[in-house]
Amino acid sequence: GVQTCALPIFQDIRYAGANNFTGRPIAGYDAAECVVKREVGVRLKAVQQELARQRLSLKMFDCYRPARAVADMVAWSRNGKETAAERRYNPAFSKADLFRLGYIATHSGHSTGAAVDLTLVDLGADNSRKFDPAKDYADCTAPAAARAPEGSVDMGTGYDCSDVKAHTAASSVTPAQRRWRSTLVAAMARQGFANYSKEWWHFSLPGAGGAAYDFPIVRAR
């Protein structure tokens, strides 16, 4: 079944708050909890244990995503309004193009509990910069010091960046950023996870999918 991810892993469940491309909490995210299928959780724990030996940690941005949340994102993309804060996430084109270009889908693997969005944290680095909703950050493709802080290694773009620079094999990132991406992809692949080529942060466990769920995410007891 699908269960809360009770693992010693950093979590910043972005759709439960305002620090995401809509600027508000998404429908169905009643708590900032990572919920995954049991097999996914077991394998994430193994990835985390391997990374710990390198003084690294995973950080979860999204796990199970209720079907109602996907519908909310679809409606948002079609409402015809776009703020500067929203545009940070898709600087090269309008949010109306997100579907056509494959950045938002009407059905998400996240709704099966078998997909996760995550990044790496360097445990030896200063990760103290916090997101300030009142600050006017540069877009998600800008240098790390100028874009919204995420308390993680520099992957070359921010999370949920709808841009070719966020494609995992993008040639426009630096060698150091490419190494971080490779470290994450390799660690996840060793436990059977497959990366989505347009998003360095998105991984799924092949064969663990199935039916989409729509129960809301609530605080773990």
In which residue ranges do the predicted regions lie?
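Acidic/histidine-rich, surface-exposed loop or edge segments in extracytoplasmic proteins
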Residues: 10-33, 163-168
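Low-complexity, Gly/Ser/Thr/Pro-rich intrinsically disordered linker/tail segments
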Residues: 186-221
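Solvent-exposed coil/turn segments that connect beta secondary-structure elements
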Residues: 18, 121-125, 160
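Short, small-residue-biased leader/transition segments that mark boundaries at the very start
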Residues: 1-7
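Active-site acidic/histidine clusters and adjacent loop/turn architecture
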Residues: 30-68, 76-77
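Acidic, His- and aromatic-enriched active-site or binding-groove loops in soluble protein domains
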Residues: 77-115, 119, 123-125, 145, ...
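Extracellular structured ligand-interaction cores
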Residues: 10, 55-57, 113-117, 150-152, ...
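Long, well-ordered alpha-helical scaffolding segments within enzyme catalytic domains
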Residues: 36-54, 128-195
